[in-house]
């Protein structure tokens, strides 16, 4: 059994009510046969009403898990407990309107083929961490990763985590960090 969880907070620091605008992009990609497996969690009555119009299940997100300080893990733990979710859970953030249902299906196949317990997506880096420095006082800096390499060809391959699609076994949540990964997480590449 797979549950598709869509987190949709009401407040946004950058663009007011952005999730109201983004919700339709995600909702329209989900096939009708999956509607009964979709749970929209929000503290926004408008989004919850729209979700019900689609036939999705709804969850009223607590103030704690909807705050700016709460982590993705806090939210996922809450919905797993509140809704008594068992099995696989796929989280679909609204901030990826270019995500397709094909992407979701391919990620789930990848997850199952590797017999994974958690999955995030990965993206290419724009800037390698070997050329990043911590900013110090007096216009100085300190390497984020200590090394003495100058040729980029010698740098280890790196990627950036991405929550375009996150999949996890319900009982894995306690073993994940605040960003939903650990040493056993697998990473799915979406171009």
Predicted regions and their residues:
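Short beta-strand/turn micro-motifs composed of small residues
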Residues: 6-8, 42-43, 93, 122
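Short, high-confidence coil segments that cap the C-terminus of an alpha-helix
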Residues: 35, 85-86, 115-117
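Short phosphate-binding loop-to-helix
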Residues: 29, 45-90, 98-106
């Amino acid at each position: 059994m797979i549950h598709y969880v869509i987190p949709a907070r009401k407040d946004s620091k950058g663009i007011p009510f952005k999730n109201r605008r983004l919700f339709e992009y995600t909702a329209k990609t989900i096939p009708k046969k999956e509607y009964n497996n979709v749970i929209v969690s929000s503290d926004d009555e408008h989004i919850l009403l729209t979700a019900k119009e689609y036939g999705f299940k709804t969850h009223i997100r607590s103030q704690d898990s909807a705050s700016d300080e709460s982590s993705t893990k806090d939210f996922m733990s809450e919905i797993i407990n509140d809704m008594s979710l068992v099995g696989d859970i796929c989280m679909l953030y609204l901030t990826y309107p270019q995500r397709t249902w094909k992407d979701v299906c391919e990620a789930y196949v990848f997850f199952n083929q590797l017999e994974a317990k958690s999955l995030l997506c990965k993206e290419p880096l724009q800037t390698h961490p070997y050329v990043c420095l911590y900013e110090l006082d007096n216009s100085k800096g300190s390497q984020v990763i200590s090394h003495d390499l100058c040729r980029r060809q010698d740098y280890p391959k790196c990627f950036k985590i991405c929550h375009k699609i996150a999949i996890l076994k319900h009982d894995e949540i306690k073993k994940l960090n605040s960003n939903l990964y650990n040493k056993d997480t697998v990473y799915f590449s979406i171009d």
